[in-house]
C-alpha cells in the first residue's frame, strides 16, 4: 500500500498564472486538492503502468477511522484491491476534510493504514537518511540504525517541518513508536535516494536508515483500532484498580 500526498501542490502548480478570486486557506486547499488529485493519480497511473502494475486510488479522512463500520469497510476495500493485484494509493481527501479533524500529516495516515492492514512493515520516506544522533549538518553525526523498545530519542529529535508537509521528524518518531509497539517494523529512510525501496528489501544491512524494532507478540485488530482512535472519544469510562489490572493482563482478549 502506498501513501502519497502532493495533490495540493500539484493543483497549485497547475493553476499557477490563472486569475483566481481571493480565497481563504480552506477554499484554496479544496480547489488545489480537487485539481491536483487528478494530475497526481494520473502520474502514478502512467509510472506503474509502464511496469505492468495496476493501481487504484483511495481517498480517506480521519473521520473514516472513527467508527468500526467505516474502519472495516475501508480495510475491506484495500484488502480486495491487494487480492486482485491492485496497489492502493492512499491520500487524505482534502476537498472535504474538516480542518479540526485532519491528519497531522501523511506520516500519521500511513501509521493508521499500516495498523489497520496489519502490515509487516511501514517504510516512511523522508529527505534525510533517518534519525541522527545530532544535527545532520554537524560533521561526525551518524544515523541511529536501530531504536529498541523504550529507547529515549528526545535529545535527537528536531521539531522543524519540511516545506511541503504539516509534520516533521517529531511526528514521524511518534508514529513510528506507536506502530512498532503494535508489533510492526518501522523504517525511516531517505526517499530522495535512487532505488531506496529495493535496497531496503534486498540489502537491509547495508542500507542506511533508522529501524524501529517491533514489540514481540501481536496486538488484536480491535486494540489497534482503539489505539488510533483517541481523538474520537464520546464519553468517559471509570474503572477501579482491579478492572485496570484485568484489562492490562495477558488474559485480556479485546
Predicted regions and their residues:
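C-terminal catalytic "cap/lid" subdomain
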Residues: 1-54, 58-254
Amino acid at each position: 500500500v502506498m501513501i502519497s500526498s502532493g495533490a495540493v501542490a500539484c493543483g497549485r502548480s497547475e493553476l499557477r498564472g490563472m486569475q483566481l478570486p481571493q480565497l481563504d486557506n480552506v477554499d484554496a486547499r479544496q480547489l488545489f486538492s480537487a485539481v491536483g488529485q487528478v494530475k497526481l493519480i494520473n502520474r502514478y497511473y502512467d509510472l506503474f503502468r509502464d511496469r505492468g502494475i495496476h493501481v487504484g486510488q483511495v481517498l480517506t479522512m480521519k473521520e473514516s477511522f472513527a467508527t468500526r463500520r467505516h474502519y472495516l469497510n475501508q480495510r475491506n476495500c484495500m484488502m480486495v484491491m491487494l487480492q486482485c493485484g491492485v496497489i492502493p494509493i492512499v491520500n487524505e481527501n482534502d476537498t472535504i476534510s474538516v480542518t479540526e479533524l485532519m491528519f497531522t500529516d501523511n506520516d500519521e495516515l500511513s501509521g493508521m493504514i499500516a495498523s489497520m492492514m496489519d502490515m509487516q512493515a511501514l517504510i516512511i520516506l523522508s529527505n534525510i537518511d533517518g534519525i541522527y544522533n545530532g544535527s545532520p549538518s554537524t560533521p561526525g553525526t551518524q544515523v541511529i540504525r536501530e531504536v529498541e523498545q523504550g529507547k529515549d530519542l528526545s535529545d535527537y529529535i528536531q521539531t522543524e517541518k519540511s516545506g511541503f508537509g504539516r509534520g516533521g521528524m517529531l511526528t514521524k518518531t511518534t508514529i513510528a513508536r506507536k506502530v512498532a509497539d503494535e508489533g510492526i517494523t518501522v523504517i525511516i529512510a531517505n526517499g530522495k535516494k535512487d532505488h531506496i525501496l529495493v535496497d531496503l528489501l534486498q540489502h537491509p544491512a547495508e542500507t542506511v536508515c533508522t529501524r524501529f524494532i517491533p514489540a514481540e507478540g501481536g496486538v488484536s485488530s480491535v486494540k489497534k483500532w482503539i489505539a488510533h482512535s483517541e481523538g474520537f472519544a464520546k464519553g468517559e469510562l471509570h474503572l477501579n484498580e482491579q478492572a485496570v489490572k484485568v484489562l492490562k493482563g495477558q488474559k485480556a482478549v479485546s
